[in-house]
């Protein structure tokens, strides 16, 4: 008697099609294309989990740079002054302070300027 793999194959294909739910066009209907797209989306997700950290750091640096240049200090001098004045605030917190509490950021900047001279 031969072994019929119909239910097993259907289950395996439904598993991949469930993962491809919401994709556009044949990528959510056709088994082969759906499987390829799911695997590709996993590679994109893996890559982008690494890249999101870079993107946020660039954003924080751009915000800090804009806030410091408004006061006449470049970003690199500001970071150098932070290290000299032994202020240990990370870039994320500095950018949040620069946006939401500009007076506090100005106080930090004046302290940094005093250590630069």
UniProtKB/Swiss-Prot annotation:
GO terms for cellular component: ribonucleoprotein complex; ribosome. Gene3D superfamilies: 6.10.160.10, Ribosomal protein L20. Keywords: Ribonucleoprotein, Ribosomal protein, RNA-binding, rRNA-binding. CDD domains: Ribosomal_L20. GO terms for molecular function: rRNA binding; structural constituent of ribosome. GO terms for biological process: ribosomal large subunit assembly; translation. HAMAP family: Ribosomal_bL20. Binds directly to 23S ribosomal RNA and is necessary for the in vitro assembly process of the 50S ribosomal subunit. It is not involved in the protein synthesizing functions of that subunit. Belongs to the bacterial ribosomal protein bL20 family. This is Large ribosomal subunit protein bL20. The lineage of its organism: Bacteria, Bacillati, Mycoplasmatota, Mycoplasmoidales, Metamycoplasmataceae. The gene is rplT.
